[in-house]
């Protein structure tokens, strides 16, 4: 019997002509329907560039949504758990948003241009959900993923590289600040943001400018040993920094087939982003307030020190009674810390917070210890 199998071809980013030439491994990854390199040369060299020099990564596949309208500020305030009432124009904020049950839909960054114009960047496609949530608000949405080319320029020499590129006075840009530049005759938005835990910036421009931007930045960083880096190196840096990743360290509520897979902000270390005292209502506020008051969070996300040097991703964690108490969600050997480190989701009371941003020391056998 013949079967008609249909596949959707992966799209190429505006930087593909350059990233494909730079890749010596031909290893690629499907990121939101785009093909991007997982590794250009070796992950170790790319990681080293991110930690000691300048690294460049194609961020174009990241979901990008423009939010416009007279109620844009009010809608964003309704959408996210964080109080953004004091957020200034031309700044960026790290945010999470939940469903009405207080379970995390995704995390991301919100760029504020004015009270009537924002850009939301995140890992999971939420265009339809934004529309469904906006009933009663005077707002419109544009999926800008395909119409905005983006690069991450990360590492301790990233500022010097971008100044060579033409971003004058970039050293004055504060963390989570953003500024519009005109470089080589085209507009470039530069934000001091990133996913490596190091000094870094993200650049946003029209796709027509992508190849010139790539070539110019690579030339600007030539003396600073600039190097492209792929998804594997990014994974290493974000684990070291303790940054969470949707559908890796937790399942997005909309993607979870079973409620038990969903997580609240308090269960993934994001309680500091939940501002229950903000005056306006936000999606999930009632459920999160109840969870906070009753203390009935079932799990927590913690960092681990792993004995030995064997990969620990997906490993089950047991207590002294050989009972399953959690699972390792992400792990790596850290060249910087010279340790085998990991992130893990544990059942409470293991790893319960005792102070804001602090967790208790929980020592486990088999063969993992949990200080965070």
Regions flagged by a language model, labelled:
Residues 1-95, 103, 232:
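Acidic, proline/glycine-enriched N-terminal capping motif
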Residues 1-24, 30-31, 38, 112-364, ...:
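Conserved, structured C-terminal
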Residues 56, 86-88, 97-103, 108-114, ...:
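Short, charge-rich binding segments
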Residues 61, 71-76, 93, 104-109, ...:
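Generic hydrophobic, aliphatic-rich segments that mediate packing or membrane embedding
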